[in-house]
Amino acid sequence: YVLISGNHRLNSFKLLKRSNIPAVVHEEDNALVHQLIELEENLSKNSLTVLEEGDHIVLREKILIELGQKSVAGSNNYTKKAMSNATLSEQLKMNKRTYQYKKQVSKINEATKKLIADTKTADNLNDLITLSRQPENVQIEVGKILHNKQARTFKRALLMAKTKFINSTWTKENEE
């Protein structure tokens, strides 16, 4: 058997030295379905940061597309029962706009995500949306600044990063 969800419950029962644990056993042997169930459970908890939530939402959509459960732009949505973004956002109990913003967060450069994962910015939707709209070099620089605690706020880190690249561009133009 493979444990897909309920790890905290399993550990609690082990600590209590109980030999029987109530469980739901699925006969499904599809790894994608297992991954989808795990993602659903993680998204239903409130322990994820906004940064993690965005990645989970995008991965969930990719799996649903592979399983033929999500509608894709350009396909005929009337011939099959595929879910739309509106339906997916309702399932997660969020409005469509918030859902779209959280998906946008996943566009942040992977190296930057790792750098900011343990900062306050990782849980601030507005800051993450702003960061996702920046060029990759600015994103990475903001990540380094926040990770190294060279700035206390996201806005300050963004200003420092943009200034660095404006200064380097200005210097190159003057050398010519």
Question: PLM features: what roles do these ranges have?
Answer:
Residues Y1-V2:
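Short active-site oxyanion
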Residues L92, K96-E176:
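Amphipathic alpha-helical extensions and coiled-coil-like segments
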Residues R9-S106, I129-R133:
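Amphipathic, charge-rich alpha-helical segments that serve as recognition/docking helices
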